Amino acid sequence: MGGRYCEDCAYQVINEKNHYIKGIGNKQSNKIIVFPHLGFSDKTIINSEAFKQISELYDTLFDRNILDDYYITCFVKCPISIKHPIDVMTKARCYNYLREEITNNKYNILILLGNACSLINVRPHSTNNVYRNCTGHYVFVNYSPFVIRYDLLKDSYISKFTSIFKAIAYNNLKEFIIKDL
């Protein structure tokens, strides 16, 4: 499955050998989107409902495939089940993979979706801010993943992501308050 970090992980046993979730998209991009995890029935990012919705929005805004401009990955590298919560050791193992993906991509923009920020231990003050880490990289945080209560909050999701994608595309972060992490 995943390799050296997955040894003795409960999710490796649950998911057998063939369900390791790999990132997709442009590995040379300096922009990364991190989903917290996929549901147990999702085997790949591209088939997940959350990816389909964010991809459709991006295509509508820019008439481009999001995979041409972004690298997209998950924090937890196995599809997870509600019956088996993510424990501290699982977070630590998966964080090692994410750290390698982020380091190898030399990102400048990182968009954390859902609870990915808490899994990575980023503690933002507000989702209306953009955070700059100590190396000058920008981190966008969105507590509202597309997969939860999307039907009730669709307009606010679309508005939030439209402003994020446009700010990044046009290199204009003026509408966001930039704070240091």
List where the protein language model places each region.
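A polyanion-binding, active-site-adjacent surface
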Residues: 1-181
